[in-house]
Amino acid sequence: MNEELRRKNEGITQDSSSLLIPHSSLTIENLVAGYPGRVLVRNLFLYLPAAGFVAVVGHNGSGKTTLFRVLTGQLPYEGRVQLLGQEIRTLRRTAAAGLLGYLPQRGTIDFAIAVRELVVMGRYRHHGLLSAYNPADYALADAALARVGMAHLAARDFTQLSGGEQQLVWLAQLSLQDAQVYLLDEPTQQLDVYYRRQVFGLLHDWATNHGKTVLCSTHDLDNLPELTGHLLNLSEPEPQLRPLSAATVLQARHWLERAPAPARS
């Protein structure tokens, strides 16, 4: 069964499997993770290619955030989890190494800061603790803001922006980390229709045009059929990658309209 799940997730044949596995950006085998008395992810197998977009869906409590906490090294786990061929539990600073970029669920900043100054902080791994950002860093920040359509707000106070504008600024900062794998935990939460489409469009562009692996947890199913990539529904008993399409999104919607399964101990 484990081998069958692996092949379903990769969409490969017997002859091609040995060629594709070494190029996986993320390999998960028999993952078990959760919290005392409550297992949220059990026996998960997942093999992601070196580039692509993956929408991670599921009920609240199905393990979406738990999976991301494992991948960012914040939560112990059982099983095998390899990021670009390296076991996660042996990596101390995936972000500093340029392997992984992570945008958690929307937070707040309670102090005034110019948008440009916030975005340039995405270059932190290229500098020492006390070194200053240079003109080249700011040029990259300006380019990142232009790509997300926020260049005209570079001098504005970030705290005065709308929720959608703030999220695009966070994406600009995240892009400056230039990681191979990006995790985004519900990046369209509480955004209106326009900004949800903007965010998904940017993430899809990272995967299809810039060779990044993008995992995006979301409850927003409406925009997914328009994207190219895969869908992972953690509410299924045996989650597996499925191509994104109107049919697979509808299937996921039917799953999510059911009552969630009881938490496992």
Give the positions of each predicted feature.
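Helix-to-loop junction immediately C-terminal to a conserved catalytic motif
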Residues: 72
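Catalytic Walker B motif of ABC-type/P-loop ATPase nucleotide-binding domains
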Residues: 182-186
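Conserved ABC ATPase "signature" region
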Residues: 120, 135-153
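The feature captures the beta-strand-to-loop junction immediately N-terminal to the Walker
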Residues: 57-59
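H-loop/switch region of ABC-family ATPase nucleotide-binding domains
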Residues: 218-219
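Conserved ABC transporter NBD signature motif
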Residues: 79-87, 96
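Conserved ABC ATPase signature
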Residues: 157-161, 165
